[in-house]
């Protein structure tokens, strides 16, 4: 399913709507160029899961954990990882077993570990306009914006 957004706030709104319907253990594999809006989408996702705290890119920490919402949110940035072999060094399997949502930026760097993932592809179509594709392994019938 595709969504067209015209501002970062609208991109966040799509993320928030998705956050309200996700089930425990969901892996979201983000794809998109630098500056496409992956972190903005995750800010909305966190809001949809019930978080009020600021959401920032985990570029330097590799993973940011948000606990205390409807489900735990683990926000990963795989930009600096060379391959999925590096995932095991950061405890990927432990995160999967915790029953939260794993939101993975730069998932293409670890694509072979994204089994059963929901793919979120964000295309930059203008300065603030985006086309967001959501595909695979999720029923979007209950998604309401």
Show which residues each predicted segment covers.
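Short phosphate-coordinating micro-motif centered on Lys-Gly-acidic
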Residues: 1, 47, 85-87, 93-145
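The conserved Walker
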Residues: 34
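Conserved lysine of the Walker
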Residues: 38
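N-terminal pre-Walker A segment at the start of P-loop NTPase domains
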Residues: 1-17
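Short beta-strand-centered segment that lines the nucleotide-binding/catalytic pocket of NTP-utilizing
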Residues: 51-66
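Hydrophobic anchor at the beta1->P-loop junction of P-loop NTPases
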Residues: 28-30
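Phosphate-binding P-loop
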Residues: 19-24
């Amino acid at each position: 399913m595709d969504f067209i957004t015209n501002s970062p706030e609208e991109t966040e709104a799509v993320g928030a709507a998705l956050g309200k319907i996700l089930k425990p253990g969901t892996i979201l594999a983000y794809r998109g160029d630098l500056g496409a809006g992956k972190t903005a989408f995750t800010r909305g996702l966190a809001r949809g899961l019930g978080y009020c705290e600021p959401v920032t890119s985990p570029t330097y920490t590799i993973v940011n954990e948000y606990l205390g919402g409807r489900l735990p949110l683990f926000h990963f940035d795989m930009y600096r990882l060379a391959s999925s072999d590096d995932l095991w060094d950061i405890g990927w399997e432990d995160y999967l077993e915790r029953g939260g949502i794993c939101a993975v930026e730069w998932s293409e760097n670890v694509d072979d570990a994204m089994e059963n993932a929901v793919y979120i592809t964000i295309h930059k179509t203008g300065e603030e306009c985006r086309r967001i594709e959501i595909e695979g392994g999720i029923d979007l019938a209950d998604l309401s914006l």
